[in-house]
Amino acid sequence: MSDRIDRDVINALIAGHFADPFSVLGMHKTTAGLEVRALLPDATDVWVIEPKTGRKLAKLECLDSRGFFSGVIPRRKNFFRYQLAVVWHGQQNLIDDPYRFGPLIQEMDAWLLSEGTHLRPYETLGAHADTMDGVTGTRFSVWAPNARRVSVVGQFNYWDGRRHPMRLRKESGIWELFIPGAHNGQLYKYEMIDANGNLRLKSDPYAFEAQMRPETASLICGLPEKVVQTEERKKANQFDAPISIYEVHLGSWRRHTDNNFWLSYRELADQLVPYAKWMGFTHLELLPLNEHPFDGSWGYQPTGLYAPTRRFGTRDDFRYFIDAAHAAGLNVILDWVPGHFPTDDFALAEFDGTNLYEHSDPREGYHQDWNTLIYNYGRREVSNFLVGNALYWIERFGIDALRVDAVASMIYRDYSRKEGEWIPNEFGGRENLEAIEFLRNTNRILGEQVSGAVTMAEESTDFPGVSRPQDMGGLGFWYKWNLGWMHDTLDYMKLDPIYRQYHHDKLTFGMLYNYTENFVLPLSHDEVVHGKKSILDRMPGDAWQKFANLRAYYGWMWAFPGKKLLFMGNEFAQGREWNHDASLDWHLLEGGDNWHHGVQRLVRDLNLTYRHHKAMHELDFDPYGFEWLVVDDKERSVLIFVRRDKEGNEIIVASNFTPVPRHDYRFGINQPGKWREILNTDSMHYHGSNAGNGGTVHSDEIASHGRQHSLSLTLPPLATIWLVREAE
């Protein structure tokens, strides 16, 4: 036989060190005719088969006892479809040869992936069930440009890296292979000889499903069908919509009482979804559900960005949960972590033996606070991986919004770093220009492709224009968490009321910058961990005063301009900090009616009242929607303002942050007439003292605070009241 393969090539193939298997394996034209070569470890006999007739065309010669076979097909000149009949351990198996198939990735896809402009890279990369030339199987593609060899290993080939080495597309650095017979539900990984000659096993960055920790294999499963955005869901995200978010960690919202094990996605659909709906929330926000190895990271150190965690069920179970939320009228927000990833060896870290996804210099690529690695946003393929992921969750799962975690750590090169521990940008500044461009590009693409979905930024500095359009120099987010408001108001509320008069500005300062961004007011998971205490436990005084303070604070928060966010457990005033390894303290709501029931009823009424009255949400980001009536009564710690809708209808909000009732408290108003109390956090319904105004109160033509008409109210102790003007 001519064109005999060099012994060194055979040795390299068998040892798994040969980078170009398609140049040797499969069908080739040689001077002797059509030659078929195959690497089939442990096989004893191999024939080339005519598929239509089952006729044996030629027996391949075993050139190496370790499994290398070769043979010339007599009387054939042109390539044709064939199969291999392989005898393993005395049993014959009919297989299709993976090395008879041509390149998989189309030239346009390869070009877009290399340019980093492929809108949906997950439709090409990863594992996809496919049929090629009438043969069913799975096509695998992975970006690893510096690897010396990459193989697919899995349940279909005994996890043997010799059996399925891949083809390198040099123009893109992508390795590809179609494996006949590999099917949905099978586990796989990529085995590679990395740039340094080390053998590595890597999970698929684009895996759509993965094993539950501590196992780390990827799972073949098809792309989920696209989810249509409904007009109702789009409207629920808009600036003038009532948005009240229930933030949830699925692993600890509620657990099975007999074994402390998690509820499944489907059980959560049956329990969490109706509860959130009954409580009057409009949105569910889920702490990250991308696959992650460490429970204690709460999902914020993901290794499988395209795979919903298997802790609570399958990918389809997660889709069922989202569908249930939508059916209940709830939009779903997913916490998304494009800022960093963990150092676990099976995942993205040094993926092909080089710093492929991360920066090579630890001053740029290592986050010392979290022992994680920082994405290299300036690398086109990395940015494309992340932008595509954002679109994937919205298009393929029906996620309505993404809340982007730790934006400040992305956009500042010196974030949490001392002098000398960071590298300035090309202009000598501290901004991470590549990260800023990545965020702008992500928000632009989402706005173009899925216009009803929105993004929210957790950004802890005063970086300008986070929620402003890109053409105005902004980052292009729709909303930004108002962490300054949260810190100021909690600092105020934890004070003994006798000292609050000296810190009055902590409640008023937020309005000085309120219209610089589109704010969400967050009482998030970060405020009930790491020794900060629960929200309830931060309130001063005895038990009665703690609950009264909390109710007054919630009444203030729900009335203040901005969308609302409350972490689970806070809606019924859980007394201890959040523990991700245990259920919420639902036992607090067992037995007779108590203060916890009162807070729960209040939050429900706040949500329902807030949603019903447009004045409370329609003009959150328009100065016309808010006006102070009493802003300077710091001696009595009283604050009064109005919220206003587009038609000029007003709601008066009055807060008394001392335990002293204020009788006959007079203040000027804009609209004379009869005002009805629609919410009172001191109501007996919420286990308050039930002080108030007997339902309605009429204005007087008595000048006050620079206005011709005024109201005289009873302001209950440690309470917030809302009043609406009734038609004459």
From Swiss-Prot:
One of its GO terms (molecular function) is 1,4-alpha-glucan branching enzyme activity. Pathway: Glycan biosynthesis; glycogen biosynthesis. It holds the Pfam family Alpha-amylase_C. Keywords: Carbohydrate metabolism, Glycogen biosynthesis, Glycogen metabolism, Glycosyltransferase, Transferase. It catalyses: Transfers a segment of a (1->4)-alpha-D-glucan chain to a primary hydroxy group in a similar glucan chain. The active site is at D405 (nucleophile), E458 (proton donor). The keyword Secreted does not apply. It comes from the Bacteria. GO terms for biological process: glycogen biosynthetic process. It is an enzyme of class 2 (transferase). InterPro entries: A-amylase/branching_C, Branching_enzy, GlgB, GlgB_N, GlgB_N_E_set_prok, Glyco_hydro_13_cat_dom, Glyco_hydro_13_N, Glyco_hydro_b. GO terms for cellular component: cytosol. Its EC number is 2.4.1.18. Catalyzes the formation of the alpha-1,6-glucosidic linkages in glycogen by scission of a 1,4-alpha-linked oligosaccharide from growing alpha-1,4-glucan chains and the subsequent attachment of the oligosaccharide to the alpha-1,6 position. Belongs to the glycosyl hydrolase 13 family. GlgB subfamily. HAMAP family: GlgB (MF_00685). Monomer. This is 1,4-alpha-glucan branching enzyme GlgB. It comes from Escherichia coli O157:H7.
